[in-house]
Amino acid sequence: MPAVTTSDRARAHGLSPEVRWYCESRGYEVPEWTKPLWRTPEPGEEQGARFDPARVDRVIAALRALRHTQGEWAGKPLEPSPWQVAYVLAPIFGWVIEDADGKTVRWYRDAWVEVPRKNGKTTLSAAIMVYLAFADGEGGAQVLLAAGSKDQARLAYDPIALAVGASPQMADAGVRAWKSKIIRAADGAVIKPVASVGDTLQGTNPHGYLADEMHVHKDLDLIQSLETGTGARRQPLGFVITTADA
């Protein structure tokens, strides 16, 4: 990756030079109209922060290991939209820093994403949760899908379970999707839905969590419980995604 100057960063506008380079080098053309109305500045000027393109490659590989389950694309690999790479996957997973033990970890621990309807929210969520559970280098990872009700939890869980169940790569890796959880028996890594604080209190130590459709959550108790539970993990990620026009 080429060296980046402060003036480069100032001219980059919607994308950091690092992410812009990543998209160009991987063939993603990001239309101007997809630029978010608001976004958190990336940590390019922060001491110790650096961009690791290989980490973004791994997330995208996890997405491509999943399969469409409906319509004309059924059975074909998922593919991220350029805007998903530029404004979500590359910034969240590409920026890293060394922790107190000298280990390289993600810069971001929390993400809030708002997108209009019919813009691949389910696909994006599925890819990130599968990556966190089974490809992030975290043995025995617990990934929880938080929802405001059991019905909403199923809406978050079922598309991920279907995409995993249709994936030959997931099957080869020993990952199985069941009615109430997706699990890798070799180390107990798991994805499962939760719909109340009580669901999260017994033996949970989440490496990541998804809060889908945040606007339907009655309160923040469940999310706060999940945030507290991530304390023992080296690089947890809380991912909140909701419909922008809801």
What are these regions (language model features)?
Residues 2-246:
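Phosphate/NTP-binding elements of NTP-utilizing enzymes
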